Amino acid sequence: MPTISQLIGSERKRLTRKTKSPALKSCPERRGVCTRVYTSTPKKPNSALRKVARVRLTSGFEVTAYIPGIGHNLQEHSVVLLRGGRVKDLPGVRYHIIRGTLDTAGVKDRRQSRSKYGAKAPKNN
């Protein structure tokens, strides 16, 4: 706790918060072009082949983004929309690709949590 004379000498400093997704530049989403689509292995103790893409954003950044859901149609030069949100077991992956927008197709045959994966409502006969 500072004394009165310490406060007279210099005012209290505001705490500056560091953003968790700097490449978005305070926007909710950003458009970008895939430069490389590949799989990556997670940290211990998990084991898988996670689908990720290297994306060059309109803000000028080049970032690694996760492709959620089962199966995807992305390749080099695909135009994608990115949102923030890290993948805990993939170091350096701080963004998610939004499914069902631009060149990214929604997940096929998805029944639950459809809005998160850009899937259309199933046809009921």
Swiss-Prot record:
UniProt keywords, alphabetically: Methylation, Ribonucleoprotein, Ribosomal protein, RNA-binding, rRNA-binding, tRNA-binding
**Pfam families the record matches:** Ribosom_S12_S23 (PF00164)
Q: Which InterPro entries match?
A: NA-bd_OB-fold, Ribosomal_uS12, Ribosomal_uS12_bac
> An example Gene Ontology cellular component term from the record?
small ribosomal subunit
Q: Which GO terms describe its molecular function?
A: rRNA binding; structural constituent of ribosome; tRNA binding
Q: Which GO terms describe its biological process?
A: translation
Q: Would the keyword S-adenosyl-L-methionine turn up in this protein's UniProt record?
A: no
Recorded superkingdom? Bacteria
Give me the ranges of the annotated region Disordered: 1-28, 104-125
Record-listed 3-methylthioaspartic acid modification sites: 89
Into which family does the record put it?
Answer: Belongs to the universal ribosomal protein uS12 family.
Could you tell me which HAMAP family the record lists for this protein? Ribosomal_uS12_B
Assembly and oligomerization? Part of the 30S ribosomal subunit. Contacts proteins S8 and S17. May interact with IF1 in the 30S initiation complex.
Instruction: Provide the function of this protein.
Output: With S4 and S5 plays an important role in translational accuracy. Interacts with and stabilizes bases of the 16S rRNA that are involved in tRNA selection in the A site and with the mRNA backbone. Located at the interface of the 30S and 50S subunits, it traverses the body of the 30S subunit contacting proteins on the other side and probably holding the rRNA structure together. The combined cluster of proteins S8, S12 and S17 appears to hold together the shoulder and platform of the 30S subunit.
Tell me the protein's name. Answer: Small ribosomal subunit protein uS12
What organism is recorded for this protein? Prochlorococcus marinus (strain MIT 9515)
State the encoding gene.
Answer: rpsL
